[in-house]
């Protein structure tokens, strides 16, 4: 059975002027989130800003979390990514979804009201329960770290 997540519309334009978040295709993992702005916002190279979505969610289920991710086209074509690289939404958070947008590109970029600026996915959560041990069971890799497995 598919899980349902409560969404609270904070801005009356959402669902009318600005479409509700949607999956672009039947195979899409991420919901597109839109900039719920009154006016366009220009981001100079290197600038960051917080952009409201006009939405709040309450996941409520502690076995789930949401992640906000950049849209691949904005990042690749314009250098527009998330200021915190990935946004994590805990199951007990109930506030507005805000997108930290960073222009890592070389040119100014204008975010238009209603523009799709990020995507959100839901992921399972596993919380660690730590055990103090003297040693781990041996593996082929052992303590090999950065670059240990080679490039080819």
Swiss-Prot record:
Transmembrane segments: none annotated. GO terms for molecular function: dUTP diphosphatase activity; identical protein binding; magnesium ion binding. Its main location: cytoplasm. Its cofactor is Mg(2+). It is found in: Cytoplasm. Pathway: Pyrimidine metabolism; dUMP biosynthesis; dUMP from dCTP (dUTP route): step 2/2. Substrate binds at residues 71-73, 84, 88-90, 98. CDD domains: trimeric_dUTPase. GO terms for biological process: dUMP biosynthetic process; dUTP catabolic process; protein homotrimerization. It catalyses: dUTP + H2O = dUMP + diphosphate + H(+). It comes from the Bacteria. Disulfide bonds: none annotated. This enzyme is involved in nucleotide metabolism: it produces dUMP, the immediate precursor of thymidine nucleotides and it decreases the intracellular concentration of dUTP so that uracil cannot be incorporated into DNA. This is Deoxyuridine 5'-triphosphate nucleotidohydrolase.
